[in-house]
UniProtKB/Swiss-Prot annotation:
Domain of life: Bacteria
Protein family according to the UniProt entry: Belongs to the bacterial ribosomal protein bS20 family.
Pfam families tied to this protein: Ribosomal_S20p (PF01649)
Organism: Bradyrhizobium diazoefficiens (strain JCM 10833 / BCRC 13528 / IAM 13628 / NBRC 14792 / USDA 110)
Name the record gives this protein: Small ribosomal subunit protein bS20
Cellular component annotations (GO), alphabetically ordered: cytosol; small ribosomal subunit
Its biological purpose: Binds directly to 16S ribosomal RNA.
NCBIfam families: S20
BP GO annotations: translation
């Protein structure tokens, strides 16, 4: 339990930040899930459109330190490669 006033304030700030980050992470995961579902159905046009929404969501999450930059880049790269396979 926090004893000092500053520690109590820090605890409140952490709780607020955690809630915001959780929301952003959920939104990011949903965007990625939409791409994966479009890939599973084999709909290339829908997958490309979903990726256009997912890529900025991933990069924003990386920029705000919700996920690591390399993690975001890796996810975008892998999703792009899967979409490229659909074209063949």
């Amino acid at each position: 339990m926090a004893n000092t006033t500053s520690a109590k304030k820090a605890t409140r700030k952490i709780a607020r930040r955690t809630a915001v980050n959780k929301s952003r992470r959920t939104q990011m995961r949903g965007a990625v899930r939409n791409v994966e579902e479009a890939i599973k159905t084999g709909d290339r046009a829908a997958a490309v459109k979903a990726l256009a929404n997912a890529e900025p969501a991933l990069m924003r999450a990386a920029q705000r330190n919700i996920i690591h930059k390399n993690n975001a880049s890796r996810k975008v790269s892998r999703l792009t490669a899967q979409i490229a396979k659909l074209a063949k």
